[in-house]
Amino acid sequence: CPFDAMGSTMATYGGQNVGAGKLDRLGKGLKSCVLLGVGYSVIAFLIAVFFGGPLAQLFVDGGEAEIIANVCAFLLWNTAFYIPLALVNIVRFLIQGMGFPKFAILAGVFEMIARSLAGFGLVPIIGFTGVCLGSPIAWIMADAFLIPAYFHVSKVLQKRMVPQTDVPQAV
């Protein structure tokens, strides 16, 4: 998946730039990768809109109208939220590469909570649409944690890079 590749790229990019002390490059790389993710997301959504049915029929007999309709609905709901998915992968792995792996793990916990809430809360009320919304809700919940976390770890790293001038020197 392109989002996995973007995430792996950002982990390496984050680690290299933090190691080199070039924190100013992190935001530029993040912006560039997010733009790539948005571009891919739009293309994937358009493919799902215009070719979801034929794609489903590659795997399901054309006579299975209800299954094909469910596949199309699932594709549309998920691809409509690929931008938040792109952000999850890009920001999570960037933070991990910057040296803060616990934040990446916590984002996964938020995703798990969101999927559980969708499964137990939405599916009984709205049925299959609740299933379709499980992952998008998880991605949004992870982003709600990861985006502020990125700014937090950036500030932490900025403070680490600033030389301590108010510390008395030993003579």
Where are these regions (language model features)?
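Membrane-interface helix-loop junctions in multi-pass transport and translocation proteins
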Residues: G53-P54, M112-A144, P148
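Hydrophobic alpha-helical segments of multi-pass membrane transport proteins
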Residues: W77-V91, M141-V153
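Membrane-interfacial segments
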Residues: P54-G63, I126, G130, V153-V162
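Hydrophobic alpha-helical interface/terminus motif in multipass membrane transporters
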Residues: G14, L55-A56, I95, L122, ...
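Small-residue-rich hydrophobic transmembrane alpha-helices
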Residues: C1-G52, L85-G99, F103-A107
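Interfacial segments at transmembrane-helix termini and the short loops linking adjacent helices
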Residues: F51-N78
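Residue-level recognition of transmembrane alpha-helices
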Residues: G37, L75-N78, Y82, G108, ...
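C-terminal transmembrane helix end/exit motif
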Residues: P136-V171
